Amino acid sequence: SINTPDGAIVYMGDYVIDSTMKGAYDMDLGKLAYIGKQGVLLLMQESVFSEKTGFTSPNHKLDKYFKNAVEKSEGRLIFSILPLHLLTIQNIFDAVKGTDRKVVVMGKYLQTIIEMAIREGYLDVPNGMIGDLKDLKEKNTVILVSNDREAPYYNLSRIVNGYDKYVSLEVNDSICFADPSYEAQELTSVKIKNEIAIHGINIFDVPKNKNVRLHASSQDLMLMVKIFNPKYYMPIKGEYRYQVANAKLASLVGIPNENIFLKENGDVVYIEDGTFVDKGEHIKVDDILIDGKSSSDVGELVLKDREMLGNNGLILISATVDKKTKQIINGPEVLSRGFIFAKDNLDVIEEIKKKSLEIIKNN
């Protein structure tokens, strides 16, 4: 929260209310109530689960499913996880406690997040539990593989299809999907699970009726409104219809409709001397050009890469290969941009195709 002379401005991130949590995940409702008693000018809450009835807890708890996977897997156990779901990661480490299994974290990004979370006290991991690459061959190793919402199951797919240089699937391996697939990922989820089944690998999956995303449901949201008792309320985050549902919840627990703001990206909210002033101001919000995984300004290195492409050109080689028989169905085709004119250099293009064909056949 941010304190102002007119009261606190409170921004609630993703959360669930769970009185059984301890340590870094313990929500101190007493402190929140204290902020409310001091006076809250504006409360902003997420809207993603505003249409869901009841509290999110205890549906977000996955420890028993992970414990079952650890106990029943005969060989190595691979978890596909979202890197920023620290509670899910903690549940996995808790499930491994008391066993002789080592946990190997794959990928620098996931390693960095887990190391930082341990250092800051957000993850409680016993000394010696985290192993390294030499433990990958051990039959009882637990392997954490990061899943990316923008490229779902990419890292796991590399392992399943034999492209990962560190991990190759073995007969007794098992794979556990620790996070739910989002609506836009359903087809990708079905595809990767079919590929796993073809390899004869056991799959542990969280039941679909488990609500494991850490978002506040309707009762969570209404309880927070009662605790903070804000003068103004603004739903944020989530589709517009979810924000409308969030606004209705606030109205149900006593916030006047005229004190509830439903705003779109770019709308400016002015509160002067403790009172909302509708100036109708709007900041132009444009789409952001995303380069790779970065949504920040395009850096010098990226610009240099583009300059190099502009100066030297690009050759793209494509071929269609049957993933079962490894036979070439079509191609290879050669696409040249800014390098040579294909129609004037047919001999060069044919030589590139020939070399490409050799490389594909030998790999």
Descriptions of predicted regions:
Residues 1-135, 155-165, 187-190:
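His/Asp/Glu-rich metal-coordinating catalytic cores
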Residues 40-41, 75, 221-238, 246:
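Proline-aspartate-enriched helix->loop->beta-strand connector
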Residues 70-77, 97-101, 172-176, 201-205, ...:
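Short, surface-exposed connector motifs at secondary-structure boundaries
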Residues 106-179, 280-302:
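A contiguous, basic/glycine-rich beta-loop/short-helix subdomain that forms a polymer-engagement track
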Residues 165, 169, 180-200, 347:
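Redox- and metal-dependent alpha/beta enzyme cores, enriched for Fe-S-associated oxidoreductases
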Residues 198-216, 220:
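Generic long, charged, amphipathic alpha-helical segments
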Residues 234-275:
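Anionic-ligand-binding alpha/beta catalytic cores of soluble enzymes and soluble regulatory domains
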Residues 302-363:
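Conserved bacterial/organellar gene-expression machines centered on ribosome-associated P-loop NTPases
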